[in-house]
């Protein structure tokens, strides 16, 4: 019995240390598992962002200018939970500012007008011009000549029997296609317009209801003014005749003070002026003269042909440079009015020739008024104007032209002095973007190596980033995109329940800000973590 008691007491004594160790371990686990808070500072380096500006010295137009990026910095705040010894889950918010990048441009300075000057590549200081607004010449209503009026009055409809026999049968608008074309070409009026009260539907142009009809000298006491029509039927010959006569009278009453030749010349000069910066880049010579007031019919024809050839050459030069632009060829297809052809063939007297000249010029103005090809070219040039490489090339050309103008009146000595000064000019950097970012992520951490004084851990995270700031010195709307990150760090036990986390990682963005810049970053942080 004594032996049994001794064995039992010995076993009890041996088991006591193990019980104490278990209790101590349970206490340690209880301290490690629980919530914590973390606060700290962050900094890093941007990677992945590429300039949208093309290097103008690259002949292929594919090389982008290099970016000099800033060093973003900010702070972080997080709350987490130790879910098991060595494993943590965390919800954190990080704020980064100074996410900026600069691109090298020509030497800049501010002139007396407050304009920034840029190096032309040849080295001359010239103001950087804001992109000029490209708009096609506004339509000019030309007076309807007597010949056009008489021609319009006699335009017939396609007979209804013939229209029904056609395959497929012609509707009412196609029956009156010739009259509708006259309205557009000679009067600048669309027969059908959108119905403001019924979206998606068309209606007869209300302008056609404002043309007086009926006897211009009505009887009655007192005499009544000409009737306003309640409706307009384009197939009704009497209504059509009254409409043509009324339009001709109104157009002559409101005709521009300048002659048709002067109006045409001004339009052509404006088009040439608008396209010249682009033509200079493409190496195309653009005429700089309009039409003389005494221009003959042949000169007008030749000028329209010259305009069409120049526009087509410009379009062809940029065909394929950007997507969905400069695709359709330009053919103005100017056709002289029939009355001008007759007068030209008959060798008319001076007064008749002047009338024919005005008729041809007016017809050319109407052609430019309604040219969808010219309107499309302007739209394509607006797209081209936004291209970074073209914009820089236009700035360089403008600066070079100013340099040439200055040097033209200077002597050789001043030119040599200017050249020596230009060789000393350096480069300046222009901010391409300056952004700030707020990032919210869920992160998971796991200890890789653990000692009494420190531990080495790794972690992954995913979340959302809200980016805002300026691009090309213009405010951009806030942009939200997904991010993911990975990190490796060291946690130093500073005091009971307090750790200092030194962490380095990489954050990847899955989308681009304004479809231009993908902002990824290497990030380092120093945080204090307090376990509750």
UniProtKB/Swiss-Prot annotation:
Keyword Cell membrane: yes
Region feature (Disordered): 113-140, 400-426
Topology versus the membrane: Multi-pass membrane protein
Keyword terms: Cell membrane, Membrane, Signal, Transmembrane, Transmembrane helix, Virulence
Keyword Cell membrane assigned: yes
Cellular localisation: Cell membrane
Pfam families membership: TSA (PF03249)
SUPFAM superfamilies, alphabetized: OMPA-like (SSF56925)
Residues making up the signal peptide according to the UniProt record: 1-22
Chief place of localization: membrane
Domain of life: Bacteria
Composition skew (Basic and acidic residues), residue ranges: 403-413
Chain segments annotated as transmembrane: 67-87, 480-500
GO CC terms of this entry: plasma membrane
Function: May be an adherent factor for rickettsial adsorption to the host-cell surface and a determinant of virulence of individual rickettsial strain. It is the major outer membrane protein.
NCBIfam families: Orientia_TSA56
Protein name per its UniProtKB record: 56 kDa type-specific antigen
Organism: Orientia tsutsugamushi (strain Boryong) (Rickettsia tsutsugamushi)
Lineage: Bacteria, Pseudomonadati, Pseudomonadota, Alphaproteobacteria, Rickettsiales
């Amino acid at each position: 019995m004594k032996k049994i008691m001794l064995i039992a007491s010995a076993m009890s004594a041996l088991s006591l240390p193990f019980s104490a160790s278990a209790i101590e371990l349970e206490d340690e686990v209880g301290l490690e598992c629980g919530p914590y808070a973390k606060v700290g500072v962050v900094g890093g380096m941007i990677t992945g962002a590429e300039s949208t500006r093309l290097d103008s010295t690259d002949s292929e137009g594919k090389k982008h200018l290099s970016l000099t990026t800033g060093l973003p910095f900010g702070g972080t705040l997080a709350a987490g939970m130790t879910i098991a010894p060595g494993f943590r889950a965390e919800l954190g918010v990080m704020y980064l500012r100074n996410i900026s990048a600069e691109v090298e441009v020509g030497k800049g300075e501010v002139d007396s007008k407050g304009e920034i000057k840029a190096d032309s590549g040849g080295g001359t200081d010239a103001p950087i011009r804001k992109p000029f607004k490209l708009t096609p010449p506004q339509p000019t209503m030309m007076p309807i000549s007597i010949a056009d009026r008489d021609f319009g009055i006699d335009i017939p409809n396609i007979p209804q029997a013939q229209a029904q026999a056609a395959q497929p049968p012609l509707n009412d608008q196609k029956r009156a296609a010739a009259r509708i074309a006259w309205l557009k070409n000679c009067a600048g009026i669309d027969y059908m317009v959108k119905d403001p009260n019924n979206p998606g539907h068309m209606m007869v142009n209300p302008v056609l209801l404002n043309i007086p009809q009926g006897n211009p000298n009505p009887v009655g006491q007192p005499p009544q003014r000409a009737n306003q029509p309640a409706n307009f039927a384009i197939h009704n010959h009497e209504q059509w005749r009254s409409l043509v006569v009324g339009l001709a009278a109104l157009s002559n009453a409101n005709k521009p003070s300048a002659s048709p030749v002067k109006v045409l010349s001004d339009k052509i000069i404006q088009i040439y002026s608008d396209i010249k910066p682009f033509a200079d880049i493409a190496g195309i010579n653009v005429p700089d003269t309009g039409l003389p007031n005494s221009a003959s019919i042949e000169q007008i024809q030749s000028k329209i042909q010259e305009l069409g050839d120049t526009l087509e050459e410009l379009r062809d030069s940029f065909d394929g440079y950007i997507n969905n632009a400069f695709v359709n060829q330009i053919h103005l297809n100017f056709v002289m009015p029939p009355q001008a052809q007759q007068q030209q063939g008959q060798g008319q007297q001076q007064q008749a020739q002047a009338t024919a000249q005005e008729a041809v010029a007016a017809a050319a103005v109407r052609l430019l008024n309604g040219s969808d090809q010219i309107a499309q070219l302007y739209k394509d040039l607006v797209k081209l104007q936004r291209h970074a490489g073209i914009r820089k090339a236009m700035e360089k050309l403008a600066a070079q032209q100013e340099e040439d103008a200055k040097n033209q009146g200077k002597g050789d000595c001043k030119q040599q002095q200017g050249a020596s000064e230009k060789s000393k000019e350096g480069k300046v950097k222009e901010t391409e973007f300056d952004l700030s970012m707020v990032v919210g992520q869920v992160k998971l951490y796991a200890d890789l190596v653990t000692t009494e004084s420190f531990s080495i851990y790794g972690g992954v995270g995913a979340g959302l980033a809200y980016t805002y700031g300026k691009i090309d010195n213009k405010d951009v709307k806030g942009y939200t995109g997904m991010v993911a990150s990975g990190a490796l760090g060291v946690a130093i036990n500073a005091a009971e329940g307090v750790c200092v986390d030194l962490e380095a990682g990489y954050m990847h963005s899955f989308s681009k800000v304004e479809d231009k810049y993908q902002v990824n970053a290497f990030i380092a942080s120093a945080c204090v973590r307090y376990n509750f």
